[in-house]
């Protein structure tokens, strides 16, 4: 038997060997820290016996596969602990995930005290150091095996497998789990584990199924790494827009209004309106014409566009097709409406491109299980646009749409946080799309060439295109690592035909235009959530709902403070006065808690000299400055949308 290792060296053995024994032969130290192995490119257990010629790479916790196996084993330890403490609990699934693991159980909900007890039991199991033993059973025997153990969810999983499947299990002590693996050799290597939280989760992610109890945890080989991760999680919780946005009174939700229907509070409205005005002005500079179209339309419109056949389940339909003469639907997008704006008059080739922009309110019937804060909602506002262009204009206009998106991201300080994706059709499921394969392949190649010409790194995602065309999705991750699409730019060579759109070319012939569907900043609610988490509420000054707070040191200077505030307001600065009869130190601390960029402290000297004492979150105490100079500086900062660097960790 000949084994070629990752470094190119070879090991030869006279008889078959388990990978763990090969690891020991290489180094006892390596064997102690090994988690799994890569055998001819496939991740396998260390208990796997090999024979013949193979390429072998021993993987530790430092590798992704090693981490996954380590944490997957920890999830089995969690399940064993739960079964010991709650024998009535039924096990569902328990995979490793990024940064940890979870396990779903059919059982009562759990509080922090219960999680701590389970965690304590997990540590006992680790000390026992039970070996994990893998065995297999034919499908029918596997079903009977799990029925005897009264694990209905495991039975259901096995029943979904082919008749001739060989089912694998892992046993550790008294606990046995249905699992494909791979796993550690025993529970003993699990050093630093922590149960993070518990929540509800529908069986198989389907809200029609039973709600299970999901326990989240994580595991590391070193306590120091676990502590660092827990500190990171604490920071994430502080930044979570669903928590921080409510604390800052940017938005709220109310049960009687409904899931996915947030109330944007006055502070949040200020931020969204500033972004809207900026985007609308920028689009106007770039040649966009504004439209205002209805929030709903008859089903006839969506039947023409294809949305009725391909997207109806995502729409709010008003009426019953079997009973009502006319059925309406709230719009999930603006495109078909703007097509009729284009069609309202005949266009010549000289009139193109026609760039239409609208700040649109849209409605999408998202699953209740998908709702989360501002990132997944049922009603949202978006800077949507559609460009009707000649085929020879398509590449330039598409590039310009990318440039606009990049400008918006850069202005908001978000450009380093995004990834680009070419979302393609799935040729294995052509029924999901309209148009011929050649058109799809050509348009995808056009987008690919554009991204390469612009030197934009991107990944290609099969099956993520809309039903009428491929697109560029610009995505970002939230604080929990979940990726959402922030901006979309789509190439459409098909819908003009559906709507009989045309222009007259230089020969007098009717020609089909191409269409670009695009957003400049995407959904404002989702962007607000992104900004909250990015800046932990410490927004760039131009976006802050309150930009300056004037703090008189006593009631004697309230009039001067009001005068300062009025001058700021007259210059477009969002300023307030804290004229309460509180100590100045209290007022300063409260302004800092409210994340106000600038505090202007005024007393006798400031009043006499028409100055203010400036404290900023950027540099702390900046001393006295002339009021006119401060107004000039902050208005310039707001006008240029500058993102100032915070140079002090805490204001003194």
Describe each region flagged by the PLM.
Residues 1-90, 97-652:
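NTP/phosphate- and nucleic-acid-binding module
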């Amino acid at each position: 038997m000949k084994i070629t290792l990752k470094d190119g060296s070879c090991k030869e053995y006279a008889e078959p060997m388990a990978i763990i024994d090969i690891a020991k032969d290489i180094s006892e130290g390596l064997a102690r820290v090994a988690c799994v192995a890569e055998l001819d490119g496939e991740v396998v257990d260390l208990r796997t016996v090999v024979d013949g010629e193979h390429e072998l790479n021993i993987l530790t916790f430092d590798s992704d596969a090693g981490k996954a196996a380590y944490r997957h084993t920890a999830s089995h330890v969690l399940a064993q602990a739960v079964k010991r403490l709650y024998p009535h609990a039924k096990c569902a699934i328990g995979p490793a995930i990024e940064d940890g693991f979870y396990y779903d159980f059919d059982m009562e909900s759990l509080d922090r005290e219960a999680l701590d007890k389970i965690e304590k039991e997990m540590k006992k199991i680790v000390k026992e150091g039970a070996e994990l033993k893998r065995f297999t059973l034919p499908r029918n025997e596997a079903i009977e095996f799990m029925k005897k153990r009264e694990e209905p969810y495991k039975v259901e999983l096995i029943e979904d497998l082919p008749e001739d499947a060989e089912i694998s299990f892992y046993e550790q002590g008294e606990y046995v789990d249905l699992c494909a693996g791979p796993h550690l050799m025993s529970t003993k290597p699990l050093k630093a584990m922590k149960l993070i939280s518990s929540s509800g989760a529908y069986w198989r992610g389907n809200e029609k199924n039973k709600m299970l109890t999901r326990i989240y945890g994580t595991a590391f080989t070193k306590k120091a790494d676990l502590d660092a991760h827990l500190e990171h999680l604490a920071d994430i919780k502080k930044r979570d827009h669903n928590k921080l946005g409510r604390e800052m009174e940017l938005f709220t939700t109310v049960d009687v209004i409904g899931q996915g229907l947030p109330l944007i509070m006055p502070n949040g409205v200020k931020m969204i309106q500033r972004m809207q005005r900026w985007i609308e002005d920028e689009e106007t500079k770039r040649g966009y014409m504004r439209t205002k179209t209805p929030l709903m339309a008859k089903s006839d419109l969506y039947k023409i566009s294809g949305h009725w056949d391909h997207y109806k389940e995502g729409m709010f339909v008003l009426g019953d097709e079997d009973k009502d003469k006319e059925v309406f639907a709230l719009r999930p997008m603006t495109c078909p409406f703007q097509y009729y704006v284009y069609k309202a008059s005949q266009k010549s080739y000289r009139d193109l491109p026609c760039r239409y922009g609208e700040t649109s309110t849209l409605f999408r019937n998202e699953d209740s299980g998908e709702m989360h804060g501002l990132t997944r909602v049922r009603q949202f506002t978006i800077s949507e646009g559609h460009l009707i262009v000649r085929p020879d204009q398509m590449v330039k206009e598409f590039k310009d749409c990318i440039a606009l998106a990049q400008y918006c991201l850069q202005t908001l300080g978000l450009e380093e946080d995004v990834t680009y994706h070419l979302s393609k059709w799935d040729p294995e499921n052509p029924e999901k799309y309209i148009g011929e394969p050649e058109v799809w392949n050509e348009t995808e190649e056009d987008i690919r060439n554009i991204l390469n010409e612009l030197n934009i790194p991107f990944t290609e995602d099969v099956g993520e295109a809309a039903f009428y065309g491929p697109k560029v999705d610009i995505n970002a991750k939230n604080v929990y690592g979940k990726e959402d699409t922030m901006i979309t730019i789509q190439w459409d060579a098909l819908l003009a035909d559906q709507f009989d759109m045309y222009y007259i070319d230089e020969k007098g012939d009717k020609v089909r235009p191409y269409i670009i569907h695009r957003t400049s900043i995407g959904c404002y609610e989702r962007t607000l959530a992104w900004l909250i988490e990015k800046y932990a509420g410490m927004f760039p000054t131009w976006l802050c709902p309150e930009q300056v707070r004037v703090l008189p040191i006593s009631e004697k200077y309230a009039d001067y403070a009001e005068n300062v505030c009025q001058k700021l307001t007259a210059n477009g600065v969002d300023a307030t006065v804290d004229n309460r009869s509180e100590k100045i130190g209290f007022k300063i601390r409260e302004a800092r808690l409210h994340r106000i960029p600038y505090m202007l402290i005024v007393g006798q000297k400031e009043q006499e000299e028409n100055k203010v004492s400036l404290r900023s979150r950027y540099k702390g105490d900046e001393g006295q400055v002339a009021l006119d100079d401060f107004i000039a500086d902050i208005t310039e900062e707001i006008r240029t949308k500058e993102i100032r660097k915070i140079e002090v960790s805490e204001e003194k």
